[in-house]
Each structure stands twice: as structure tokens, then as C-alpha cells.
């Protein structure tokens, strides 16, 4: 799940935001990590990454029970927010099924978030044209990025707190 500020980029982008999948996978980025409201970092484990392996080819590892752990963390963090009960049903399926590629999981989550934000229209075509995945080319530890991306917390913070007004809140 990309940080909420990533979705702000959609709101301020003049025409469209390009999402790239043909880049080399970089570890320790938003491609497989998210920080949720209580400061917990959720990380989707991936199978061994080869040197310069493309982002779209990264496979998810299911050796641990990460899906169950992530869902429990999401529930305990957001269960008292105003819109959790309404939006939880859209996200629970991601924690019940196994998706082979991280690329596909990110795309499905992204499409769901875009659909829920309503004012942002998804123009996504996974694996067609190869222009779809999280583009995180900046150094996520850098001060410069923190000035734009703030605390890097997940879009779920705002979605569960503000519901249908999330888009207005992001602006």
C-alpha cells in the first residue's frame, strides 16, 4: 500500500501519473511495505530476489502467516475509526487469497483504493503495456522525500477516518 501522499500526487498531477513495472526491484520500499496508523510497518515477504529482477516479476512468499498478521494489525489499528466497518470488506479478500506476484497484489489494492476514492479514476491494465506498479525510485530514508511524503503512513489512515471525504482531505 502506497503512502497517502502518493495518492496526493494523483490529485495534483496535470494529466496522469505513470506507474512503472519494468524497473529493477528495490528492497525496503513501498513496493512491499506500508506503515499503518499506530506506527506498525507491514511487510509483504517476497521470495529470493535476483540481481536486477524486474518489479513485475517479484513473487510473494507464503512461508509465514503474514496475511493473518497483517489483517489482525489492520483490525486492531482501525476497528474504532468511523469508516472501518464499511471499508474493511473491500480489503479483507487481499488477506484471504494467495496472489503470486507482488505486482498483481499492489495493482489490485491500488485499484480498490482508487475505486473507493471515487474522484480518482483508475486507468490500470496490469501486464499490458507494463506501465503499472508502484514507482518508488527515491531514497525513502531521505530528508527531501520526507518533506513531500510526510510520515509515509498508509492511505488507509485517511480512508478509515474520513470515508467519502478522503479525497477532499488529501487536497
What are the residue ranges of the model-derived segments?
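Residues lining hydrophobic/aromatic ligand-binding pockets adjacent to catalytic sites
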Residues: 1-123, 131-171
Amino acid at each position: 500500500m502506497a503512502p497517502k501522499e502518493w495518492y496526493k500526487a494523483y490529485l495534483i498531477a496535470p494529466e496522469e501519473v505513470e506507474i512503472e513495472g519494468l524497473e529493477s526491484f528495490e528492497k525496503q520500499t513501498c513496493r512491499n511495505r506500508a506503515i499503518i496508523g499506530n506506527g506498525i510497518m507491514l511487510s509483504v515477504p517476497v521470495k529470493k530476489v535476483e540481481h536486477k529482477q524486474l518489479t513485475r516479476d517479484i513473487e510473494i512468499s507464503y512461508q509465514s502467516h503474514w496475511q493473518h498478521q497483517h489483517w489482525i494489525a489492520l483490525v486492531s489499528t482501525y476497528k474504532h475509526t468511523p469508516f472501518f466497518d464499511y471499508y474493511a470488506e473491500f480489503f479483507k479478500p487481499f488477506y484471504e487469497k494467495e496472489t503470486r506476484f507482488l505486482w498483481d497484489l499492489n495493482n489490485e489494492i491500488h485499484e480498490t483504493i482508487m475505486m473507493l476514492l471515487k474522484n480518482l479514476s483508475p486507468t490500470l491494465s496490469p501486464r499490458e503495456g507494463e506501465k503499472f506498479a508502484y514507482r518508488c525510485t527515491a531514497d525513502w530514508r531521505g530528508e527531501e522525500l520526507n518533506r513531500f511524503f510526510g510520515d509515509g503512513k498508509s492511505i488507509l489512515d485517511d480512508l478509515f477516518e474520513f470515508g467519502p471525504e478522503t479525497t477532499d482531505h488529501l487536497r
